[in-house]
Amino acid sequence: MANWNENQDLIHGDNLLLYLTSGKTVVAYATNCSLQIDAESIDTSSKFSCRFNSNMGGKIGYTISCDSLYTANEDGISFDDLMAMMVSGEQTEWYMGQESAWTGTCETNPHTLDTTKTYFNGKAVVTSCSLEAGNNDIASCSITLTGAGEVQKNGSTIG
């Protein structure tokens, strides 16, 4: 019989972070991050398919998006860093996973990737950067990265 314990089984969204570059540097002041994986389908319908469409799996692609507060802090990846990555057009390493446990104060937390837990990684190119500054609001920014190659789980091929 399955044992379910939501206090142990579920991953709190605050602990799932996006890290970029080979140094696994966290995106500073991130408020949201997501990984979207999509597979194309190839139409294989023929007269042998009767009245139903037939498909087989095609290429797989993915995007990573992240929203964060705009900051001048240089300890994490900032909007300025992301803009420079986009202009360079070079691929960057990315990692999405839980941060390591930290017993110090919130202000001194280095937000390092916990490689003992499940994480996803790969290479991607920054394809979109936007900066938003509303009245009586903290300025925020959004980025999108488009995958270059495979998504890996814990540094290994999936499947």
Describe the predicted segments one by one.
Residues 1, 159:
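Glycine- and charge-rich intrinsically disordered segments
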Residues 148-152:
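Hydrophobic lipid-interacting interfaces of membrane-associated proteins
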Residues 2-73, 117-144:
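Solvent-exposed edge beta-strands and adjacent loop segments
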Residues 154-158:
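Membrane-proximal interfacial segments on either side of biological membranes
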Residues 76-123:
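Short, acidic/charged, Gly/Pro-enriched secondary-structure junctions
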